[in-house]
Amino acid sequence: MTAIAPVITIDGPSGAGKGTLCKAMAEALQWHLLDSGAIYRVLALAALHHHVDVASEDALVPLASHLDVRFVSTNGNLEVILEGEDVSGEIRTQEVANAASQVAAFPRVREALLRRQRAFRELPGLIADGRDMGTVVFPDAPVKIFLDASSEERAHRRMLQLQEKGFSVNFERLLAEIKERDDRDRNRAVAPLVPAADALVLDSTTLSIEQLIEKALQYARQKLALA
């Protein structure tokens, strides 16, 4: 009988610390990593590389089904590898972002990418970072964590990130945008941003990164010992 690889899902809103936590857990456990938020950007970039029309659902589905992508975390840095090439920077361009929003609108593309994401489930295990990993993509995952933080704290973290990159930021505007996105994400009809019924909800508002990682790893190891 073939062993089924365990999955730890980390869901939650932007700015709660999912990316940092997932990279740390993947490195600590030496597990595979899935950054579901980057998947649509990677597909969009692959389409641009292969001159596939991003407005054609029929052309995109086979590309999505066989998308050659993997995620590697080394010393806290995430590398996105598309067809053997590090495209971590390339997927962050505005051209790719615009194309990603187009490809994400197609139902059959979303279905193909859902299957592709599930294919990341390989031994020894998978850390899945996203918004609906525990509710839609891996509903049978033995460990589910929903990571949250106050909208004010998430706006503050985002402001610091942008300031480090040299951008001038209005905190109140940033906070309003985050609250608006939260409301939209949590109330949408398809795959709303809510904790799975069996998820541990962790609030990172007052936790240091080290405390957050320790709590999550401790919980995961306890659950996996019982799984």
Swiss-Prot record:
Disulfide bonds: none annotated. It is an enzyme of class 2 (transferase). Its main location: cytoplasm. Coiled coil: none annotated. One of its GO terms (molecular function) is CMP kinase activity. CDD domains: CMPK. Gene3D superfamilies: P-loop containing nucleotide triphosphate hydrolases. The keyword Cytoplasm applies. InterPro entries: Cytidylate_kin, Cytidylate_kinase_dom, P-loop_NTPase. ATP binds at residues 12-20. One of its GO terms (biological process) is nucleobase-containing small molecule interconversion. Its EC number is 2.7.4.25. One of its GO terms (cellular component) is cytosol. It is found in: Cytoplasm. Keywords: ATP-binding, Cytoplasm, Kinase, Nucleotide-binding, Transferase. It comes from the Bacteria. PANTHER family: CYTIDYLATE KINASE, CYTIDYLATE KINASE/PANTOATE-BETA-ALANINE LIGASE. Belongs to the cytidylate kinase family. Type 1 subfamily. HAMAP family: Cytidyl_kinase_type1. This is Cytidylate kinase. The lineage of its organism: Bacteria, Pseudomonadati, Pseudomonadota, Gammaproteobacteria, Enterobacterales. The gene is cmk.
